[in-house]
Amino acid sequence: METIAKHRHARSSAQKVRLVADLIRGKKVSQALETLTYTNKKAAGLVKKVLESAIANAEHNDGADIDDLKVTKIFVDEGPSMKRIMPRAKGRADRILKRTSHITVVVSDR
C-alpha cells in the first residue's frame, strides 16, 4: 500500500532539498531515517519530518508494518518564490528571490 506525505512551501530551494532527497530514494525507512539524522544540512531536517509523517500515515491509516516500509518515491518541486528588495548604492535596488519547495515522500510496503 502506497502512503503519501507532503510539505508544501518549505523554506528552502528545491535544488538544495533534491541533494538530500537523492540520498534516501529507494532505501528502507529505518536506513533512510538514520541517513537523514547524520546528514549535516538544513534540508535533511525538512525531509526527515516529511518521512516521519509518511511513516505515521502508513501505520495509522493503512495499518502497515514499519519494518517492511521503503521509500518508493521522493520528489521535490519548486514552490512560489517570495520577492524581496535589497537596497543598493545610488538609489538602485536588487531583487532577492526567497525560494520555496514542495517535498513529497511516498512509502510502500512492497
Swiss-Prot record:
Database matches in InterPro entries: Ribosomal_uL22, Ribosomal_uL22_bac/chlpt-type, Ribosomal_uL22_bac/org-type, Ribosomal_uL22_CS, Ribosomal_uL22_sf
Similarity annotation: Belongs to the universal ribosomal protein uL22 family.
A single BP term in Gene Ontology: translation
HAMAP family assigned: Ribosomal_uL22_B
Organism: Yersinia pestis
Free-text function comment from the UniProt entry: This protein binds specifically to 23S rRNA; its binding is stimulated by other ribosomal proteins, e.g. L4, L17, and L20. It is important during the early stages of 50S assembly. It makes multiple contacts with different domains of the 23S rRNA in the assembled 50S subunit and ribosome.
Record bears the keyword Ubl conjugation: no
One cellular component (GO) term of this entry: cytosolic large ribosomal subunit
Subunit-level organization: Part of the 50S ribosomal subunit.
Gene Ontology terms, MF aspect: rRNA binding; structural constituent of ribosome
Protein's name in the database: Large ribosomal subunit protein uL22
Keywords: Ribonucleoprotein, Ribosomal protein, RNA-binding, rRNA-binding
CDD domains, A to Z: Ribosomal_L22
Gene name of this polypeptide: rplV
PANTHER family per UniProt: CHLOROPLAST 50S RIBOSOMAL PROTEIN L22-RELATED (PTHR13501), LARGE RIBOSOMAL SUBUNIT PROTEIN UL22M (PTHR13501:SF8)
Pfam name, any one: Ribosomal_L22
NCBIfam families for the chain: rplV_bact
